[in-house]
């Protein structure tokens, strides 16, 4: 256990009890912790440092940010933290342990990790908790490609390995338990990647156009599907409304999806504009809304859509070269997160 350090914030736990919840561990033990589905991995460095390379599956919460305490107040359970050398993460560990978490701190930080020959990644990760405390990790791959880890299961959305010079090495990921495909355009429907990710047990969900080209579970707008007791999938409309654009995504052909994981509701809108049917999309925790004309929405349309859906967290995606940096200031009541979904 660590030596006494000054507590970084107040809390119900005494400082001595909080310190007993912290353990500083080496690279090998930290790597083992990263394989556990109940451990939340946090990089407490700056966003710039995180973007340059981080441990796979880690989310970024800057311990030096003024809102750090706000960001961690609802985090429970077991947490593994790291920084550059281990000092900032120790400060973060104290605050997390004061909140009741059991915390493991990486001795020597990412420098020790790299010295040991361990790999890092630039794929951004956001972590959420379900109603029963299960962790959901959402990895921003590119464009409309989303990887979701939930309770030991792998979910891939519109997997595409190569797009305009950007690539995703799907061979580095586990096989998929569920694959969701919104429609049959090349930047969403990559049959080679789907085949590579699939096993005989993989549930492949597609719209009608894709199901005509590849074996899978066809879902039309309005269809619902339960997967076990804790996962449900609903196909919802996704289409163009602007005059001269309707041919890109005709009404009733393509899908968006509402994926519910143990009560956590995730809306992946697919290629769509701000359509009337969005008013029926309710109680959304996390929304992915597309932003690039002429194929999907303008930033103004995206803002309108967000005000209709009212998600707690919003990820603009599929935005290519569209400037989405001004969206957050127009949606002060929504946690807007810009990730590399160009």
Please give the residue ranges for each predicted region:
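Rhodanese-like catalytic fold shared by cysteine-dependent sulfurtransferases
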Residues: 1, 6-33, 47-78, 84-125
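Zn-dependent metallo-beta-lactamase
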Residues: 11, 123-151, 330-333
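Active-site-proximal loop/helix segments of hydrolase catalytic cores
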Residues: 49, 242-308, 320
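Active-site neighborhood of phospho(di)ester-bond hydrolases with catalytic His/Asp-centered motifs
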Residues: 83, 156-160, 176-187, 204-208, ...
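Metallo-beta-lactamase
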Residues: 124-135, 141, 206-264, 338-342
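Pre-active-site segment of Zn-dependent metallo-hydrolases
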Residues: 128-131, 145-184, 191-195, 242-247, ...
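Active-site HxH/HxHxD metal-binding segment of metal-dependent hydrolases
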Residues: 167-226, 234-239
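Binuclear metal-ion centers of metallo-dependent hydrolases, dominated by the metallo-beta-lactamase
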Residues: 217-228, 251, 303, 307-342
